[in-house]
Regions:
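Charged phosphate-binding loop/patch that engages nucleotide di/tri-phosphates or the phosphate backbone
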Residues: 143-171
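Functional cleft and adjacent loop/helix regions within the main domain
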Residues: 55, 61, 170
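Short, Lys/Arg-enriched N-terminal segments with co-localized hydrophobic residues
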Residues: 3-21
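A generic structural signal for ordered secondary structure
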Residues: 29, 37-39, 66, 86, ...
């Protein structure tokens, strides 16, 4: 969950319910893998929110979901990654003083070309790194991201078994 400025950049459908605006937001992110390890980011938002997360962010106007996922991975982690395949969608909601935000996140299995990462401090990311599946799974703060990680990692294993991982002509 990013407590950034989603409601300023998102396509929103404002429905007044009891004085609170309901805002629908769409983000995209990636489960980025290099040599079997998964990229995670550690976010500490003004000491109110902290934990390990997958890279994701808000879709900008005119942007395709794949473009958003690639851009957000680069912005939040400094990592260059390519899309392998669509994994699925997760949903959650959170509240701000002005709104209840209903968030859809579209996830992609992605491949990096190195272990390099540099967390985006301006967005309160304090650390980043690549971790083995079982480590990453237990480090992740949110259950919905754990489910996406599990789905993406199973796809990765299937591609590895078929000798298709890393062979870009198949994607």
């Amino acid at each position: 969950m990013h407590i950034d400025v989603y409601f300023y950049l998102v396509k929103s459908a404002h429905q007044k319910t009891g004085g609170i605006a309901m805002v629908e937001a769409t983000s995209c992110g990636g489960v980025v893998i290099f040599r079997g390890k998964i990229l995670l980011l550690y976010k500490n938002y003004k000491n109110k929110y902290e934990g390990w997360v997958l890279p994701k962010g808000t879709v900008e106007e005119g942007e395709e979901y794949k473009e958003t996922a690639i851009r957000e991975v680069m912005e939040e982690s400094g990592t260059t990654a390519s899309i392998i395949k669509y994994i699925g969608k997760s949903q959650y909601s959170f509240s701000t003083p002005q709104n209840t935000v209903l968030k859809d996140v579209h996830w992609y299995l992605m491949m990096s070309d190195s272990y390099y990462s540099k967390p985006q401090r301006e967005e309160f990311f304090m650390d980043s790194g690549y971790y083995k599946f079982h480590e990453a799974y237990h480090m992740l703060k949110f259950a919905n991201e754990k489910q996406i990680l599990e789905r993406a990692y199973n796809e990765y294993i299937d591609l590895k078994k078929s000798n298709l991982w890393g062979n870009k002509k198949y994607f």
